[in-house]
């Protein structure tokens, strides 16, 4: 019975130690702090939709120079690659044969005309029959037609430019024999001012644009609804602005695209037929576009765009987005974000949906662009 006080003391000591240990653990566990995130407040802004489409230049008018009579070329009267005017003489074909033919036609006309006039007097005197007079008059008419034909052939020995423009390389030299109806053109003239640019656009993009315009989601771009800018192969911007001319009704079955034709002034002949270019088309204006910084848009396992926003209770929400294209460093959002939403762009790795957070203005993105800045950046937008 003497060991009971010792056991009691030992138990008391252990209990006291356990109690003190629990108190220390409670004191060592601080309260969890809300993570800090940087947000951007979404604001709607006017945005001109643009599409950059590949295309090629083509001459406004093209004419092949061909001979209309047979003969030997005596002279070439132009410089290859020069500008020629409509009606300017380009070649001289040997006219000797046609001059002789013309002289013969004139003589024949004099003879048949004289005979017809004599028969007309004689028929009144009944010295010749009506049939003889009719035959003589018909020969006179044939002689007049032969004379006109000879004059035309002689005129065709001077080969003239059918249109104004830049003439290319001559396929024939002095001394070469050319003939009416030959397959090879003597030269080709191309009118380069103005000049066409043929670009392609998918039918899906055209249909979407038309639906948006009909529903009122997009407004026509005012007087610039059909304006087109041109980017050259070296990346520079062509200084002249063009206008949209028409859209082909037929769809290319192999590519599923339609061809748009734009017309550009080309006074300096900077653009030449066959050049590869990109046309920037101003398709319409979205007066309340939602632009989200790319830092705040991520992809889920399926590749769909998502975003995290902070609600009124300062808790994180997950949003599924529908993004159509990029504009500089922003995404154009069609669904999933609304004006006033606070989009998280900083601290995404520290939060998840449902977590309460502390909010501050993001420092890793630029402030939303004003109207002038937005218009300056529109040229960088490309359809995905």
From Swiss-Prot:
So what does this one do?
The periplasmic linker protein component of a constitutive organic solvent efflux system. Involved in export of toluene, styrene, m-xylene, propylbenzene and ethylbenzene. Also exports AMP and the antibiotics carbenicillin, nalidixic acid, chloramphenicol and tetracycline.
Give the residues carrying a lipid (S-diacylglycerol cysteine).
Answer: 23
Chain residue ranges for the region called Disordered = 362-384
Subcellular location per UniProt equals: Cell inner membrane
Gene Ontology terms: biological process: response to antibiotic
Keyword line? Antibiotic resistance, Cell inner membrane, Cell membrane, Coiled coil, Lipoprotein, Membrane, Palmitate, Signal, Transport
| The keyword Signal appears for this protein | yes
Known Pfam families for this protein? CusB_dom_1, HlyD_D23
How is this protein positioned relative to the membrane?
Answer: Lipid-anchor
CC terms in the record's Gene Ontology section: plasma membrane
Protein's name according to its UniProt entry: Toluene efflux pump periplasmic linker protein TtgA
